[in-house]
Amino acid sequence: MAGAPRRQRAVGRVRLGVNAIAGKSRVSDVAEAGSLRVRMPRVDGPAVEGVLVNTAGGVACGDHFTIEVKAEAGAHAVVATPAAEKIYRSDGETARIDVAITVEAGAQVDWLPQETLLYDAARLARRFTVDLAPDATFLAFEAIAFGRVARGEEMRTGHLEDHWQVTRGGGLIYADAVRVSGPLGELLRRPTVAAGNRAWATLLYVAPDAEARLDEARALMESARSECGASAWNGLLAARWLAPDIETLRRDAVAFLNAFRGAPLPRVWAL
């Protein structure tokens, strides 16, 4: 007897390219496939804003999404999402999200998606690859919430792999790998993991002035309710937040990002 048919999974791909003409950034390349789209709202200012939209309504077991962003010399791209990305319960297969970002000479990319929300028993593997020119600027913020705290859901089990690799001028300057799997509720309660907190976030800022802005970043964290801290080395600045729920973390992070960037977050963050 033939086995059960394989379930249909969502596959999506987006490619966004931005160049600079007369000091203003413009879209130079767009490609979309499957259930992933990118929309460019009208915004004031020199940057192109791209909003990633998942028409599948979330990410389920076995889904695979690929995102490529390239800022050509002197261009500035800001990439965001209109809502939290929901990672639904899996019956065994792992969803994958692959992000590749290229930032050429004098260009800038701000990677500012809203939080990733992991449902109980979700399985996700994400990989970020970032290639920077020596004088490029890259700012990324990523937040993860474990379980729907507002609905009383504890993430009892699940799987998360989160890999970051950043090169500048062809040399590796940052690599970070997180892997938590199995009884996540128990793991998150451990003092050496999350001490019972249910949301965490990472900010990475790579720029010629990154190390010089460390005191500024720490000062902006002084009034935060989350546990947080920042450090800087080798032309990059890294900051982390840890909070009991995503609402607390989000309030702290929004205040930090608005001040640190010197500009408000994309309007979709307020929807």
From Swiss-Prot:
InterPro entries: UreD (IPR002669)
Protein role: Required for maturation of urease via the functional incorporation of the urease nickel metallocenter.
Entry keyword set: Chaperone, Cytoplasm, Nickel insertion
One GO MF term: nickel cation binding
Protein name: Urease accessory protein UreD
Cystine crosslinks: none
Recorded family membership: Belongs to the UreD family.
Compartment(s) where it occurs, according to its Swiss-Prot or TrEMBL record: Cytoplasm
Cited Pfam families: UreD
HAMAP family: UreD
Major localization class: cytoplasm
PANTHER family, per the entry: UREASE ACCESSORY PROTEIN D (PTHR33643:SF1)
GO-annotated cellular components: cytoplasm
Quaternary structure and interacting proteins, as annotated: UreD, UreF and UreG form a complex that acts as a GTP-hydrolysis-dependent molecular chaperone, activating the urease apoprotein by helping to assemble the nickel containing metallocenter of UreC. The UreE protein probably delivers the nickel.
Transmembrane domains' residue ranges: none
